[in-house]
Amino acid sequence: MQVLPPSATGGPSRLFILRPVATTLLMVAILLAGIIGYRFLPVSALPEVDYPTIQVVTLYPGASPDVVTSAITAPLERQFGQMSGLKQMASQSAGGASVVTLQFQLTLPLDVAEQEVQAAINAATNLLPDDLPNPPVYSKVNPADPPIMTLAVTSSALPMTQVEDMVETRVAQRISQVTGVGLVTLSGGQRPAVRVKLNAQALASLGIDSETVRTAITSANVNSAKGSFDGPERAVTLSANDQMKSADEYRNLIIAYKNGAPVRLGDVATVEQGAENAWLGAWANKQPAIVMNVQRQPGANIITTAETIQKLLPQLTESLPKSVQVKVLTDRTTNISASVNDTQFELMLAIALVVMIIYLFLRNIPATIIPAVAVPLSLVGTFAVMVFLDFSINNLTLMALTIATGFVVDDAIVVIENISRYIEKGEKPLAAALKGAGEIGFTIISLTFSLIAVLIPLLFMGDIVGRLFREFAVTLAVAILISAVVSLTLTPMMCARMLSHESLRKQNRFSRASERVINRVIARYGQLLKRVLNHPWLTLGVALGTLALTVLLWIFIPKGFFPVQDNGIIQGTLQAPQSVSFASMAERQRAVADVILKDPAVESLTSFVGVDGTNPSLNSARLQINLKPLDDRDDRVQTVIARLQEAASRVPGATLYLQPIQDLTIDTQVSRTQYQFTLQANSLEALSTWVPKLIARLQTLPQLADVSSDWQDNGLVAYVNVDRASASRLGISMSDVDNALYNAFGQRLISTIYTQANQYRVVLEHNTTATPGLAALDGIRLASSDGGMVPLSAIAKVEQRFGPLTINHLDQFPSTTISFNVPDGYSLGDAVDAITQAEADLAFPAEITTQFQGSTLAFQAALGSTLWLILASVVAMYIVLGVLYESFIHPITILSTLPTAGVGALLALLIAGAELDVIAIIGIILLIGIVKKNAIMMIDFALAAEREQGMTPREAIYQACLLRFRPILMTTLAALLGALPLMLSTGVGAELRRPLGIGMVGGLLVSQVLTLFTTPVIYLLFDRLGHAVRRRLPAREEEA
């Protein structure tokens, strides 16, 4: 048994060193808890930070944008505007559709928001049109959030109406029931219906108006209760043939009698099985299809939801005929899983590199095993806490663990190096462990809490960015805390059992060679340090110059919000002139699809034309382009987008806007491009004056690309100007006119066919094949009070005007959204500055208000809080260090190292052509924590040497620098190699990881060189300052 000297107290580590079994079992418990926790952690791309968002869709076929706005959107908005917790309300009123998107505060639970929305819809019901085919339908989904999965259903044998019916009843409903699914939409509009196409001439010749036909159909097709009777012995339920379910039945329906002879519907109309909406269409790789888009609820886990759907699909497709093919075209989880797997590989690579650098410096296998055990134990133990906090395995938490690899090994290295030093001096391993751990314990605590203090401000960041990085900060802090516990318990215990004087002295050729190199480096460093200490003011000038350069770089470096990721999916909008027809738009879509599918990087394409809850106008088409896997294509997504836009520009009469789909979605509206800027006014007239001026100005700016607006006020309008006096004299009301027009041209849903599985509509319209366009209005006849038929032209004149295709509101006021991209060579910060200057130059009137939206607004908020965040980190660290050192001055000495980290990170980002975005800023904040560790290790030993050995401050700091040079170099290289895999990342999601790695590697390289010289100089200067202050204070007291 080793006899312990009295000084070998061991501090907080003593109990764990002396009880190896208990220590081992405690560490095994941490390891098992982490392994079990890992199995329960969900996988996702990013932390769940969605705003609670609900979309309310109301369809009113045939209604103009003005009617939809006044009759549907406005009543709903008035009710929604009274809800508590509402953050923003945006609406879009188009021909036949109203879409209101409600975004609530982050703190409001989605279920509570849902209850408020339902209550508001109920309150607005009495204010909505009586002939509304369906009440407003809400979905817990963000319309700007791209689908997690897109499926294409095609058939070479069956009509699309029959395919849609099967998909809707057998597939879509079941998928909608999956936990996490917010909305399943079927694009293509081929829902079955009975279409009644009236022959205007036949009606006129028989003296029948369309309202008579409509009334006859609705009266003939009913599905209501008929009662029952209860006899003495039997109960009987009443039923009747009150339902008509096929086109043949409707064709034979008698609608009137003329001259005693029946007039059947087939005599005055073409009756056929068709689609409910003839102006909707979808294609998959140019083949007609039903495109099924699955969107998740805000907050739902993408991976879990998609995996459940994938398991369910085989069962669902078995119920479909063999001629119906279901193909998954888009599954976002594929790229998310690939990105997470790449990050996990980089984490393992970081661990391997860190262990390699430890062996390089320690040159001893037992000594290398000790920190090699500490690293995975600290990381795996973190998983247990992550489960408790409802975190997930995502890119940010894995990045935190990758960076933590370099952090957590630092504590173990410092402990091992100090214990090894005493063993090499001849101490027994147990005594050396107690003495070395006791001596270094305060340093470990200082390092740990000062590093965690850097992360504290991240926990208090507000809004979406704060939620995003909370998991990152907490995961890293937990790993660091577990590392400190391991370093003060397991590490010294293992040193006492595994290290010995003989093992440390046992060296091979490589060990001796590396030892000579390191000794030479230390000797050379000592010589340079002496020269630097002899020229303190010059060194101080270098430090101040570094600070000034950091400020300049911060001002001029390009700034962004969040890295643009290559997820292999491109979202597109095809825009055509505002008066384009459905047939013409479909043709242009096919021409653009031909161009897109010829690109070697494209794997598949889905497209959609028509107006529904996802597409606001007939002159726009939605496209989703799936690229080949990253390993199978030569170009990144931005290069592919530029190439596709160039090729599509040769298609006449259409403009293609493209943007890559991102994992982080902050917007609430589907936009043509990545960034949005909104104008809001009290009236549409004010917007119509200023929007064109601003668009014209922005399109000239080099900082912007693909500038467009959703302001569309040049749609063709046939204005029916009724002579009310003439109409009244003939007994014709405005209601009669509206009904006649609606019956003819509104694809009016006049009756419902009920079946056991679904409900189908009867659609009424005029057959305009023979008389297309405005000429069809000549066939409209209205019944007068004397029973005669009056042509519309007798009481009205038709004027051709221009009107809006869509009317947009933001928080109940008219608005328009300007969309833009940022071209190569410019940053989002440049674009924001350019737009702000253009707005100032135009000098908008007071009634026009402007605001950036979505990620651009988040960028402004993040940029405004960044300096405060860094300042808060510095202040938090100063407070912690001041408390630990019981000094006002020593924390300043430690914090003087920070500018060296900033200048290195900013220079590295500038050289790499990367922007200063929120990921890079997190890297700079972490550098603050890493770089100050060098100063802490120097100052701790210098203070101890002054206090215990009576050295002068110069001798003490000089000796501390030489003694701590090896662990400082080891810990810095460990942190650098931990960040290196992130910097060199090339796989899926690399865009997200590289800014963090670039900033940290650059900052560590520069700070490592500078702090080794600036810290001792500043330490001595502050020491002289402290002595001068202390000399003056007694003198003043004597004078007093």
Curated annotation (Swiss-Prot):
Chain ranges passing through the membrane: 16-36, 347-367, 369-389, 396-416, 440-460, 472-492, 537-557, 863-883, 888-908, 911-931, 968-988, 998-1018
One Pfam family for this entry, by name? ACR_tran
MF terms from GO for this chain are: xenobiotic transmembrane transporter activity
How is it placed in the membrane, per its record?
Multi-pass membrane protein
- Say if the entry is tagged with keyword Chaperone: no
Asked if the Swiss-Prot or TrEMBL record annotates the protein with the keyword Transport, the reply is yes
Q: Where in the cell is it found?
A: Cell inner membrane
Against Gene3D superfamilies, the record matches this protein to: Multidrug efflux transporter AcrB pore domain (3.30.70.1440), Multidrug efflux transporter AcrB pore domain like (3.30.70.1320), Multidrug efflux transporter AcrB TolC docking domain, DN and DC subdomains (3.30.2090.10), Multidrug efflux transporter AcrB transmembrane domain (1.20.1640.10)
Cellular component aspect of the GO annotation: plasma membrane
**Swiss-Prot/TrEMBL keywords:** Cell inner membrane, Cell membrane, Membrane, Transmembrane, Transmembrane helix, Transport
Q: Hey, which family's this protein in?
A: Belongs to the resistance-nodulation-cell division (RND) (TC 2.A.6) family. MdtB subfamily.
Quaternary structure (record): Part of a tripartite efflux system composed of MdtA, MdtB and MdtC. MdtB forms a heteromultimer with MdtC.
Q: Which NCBIfam families match?
A: PRK10503.1, RND_permease_2
Descriptive protein name:
Multidrug resistance protein MdtB
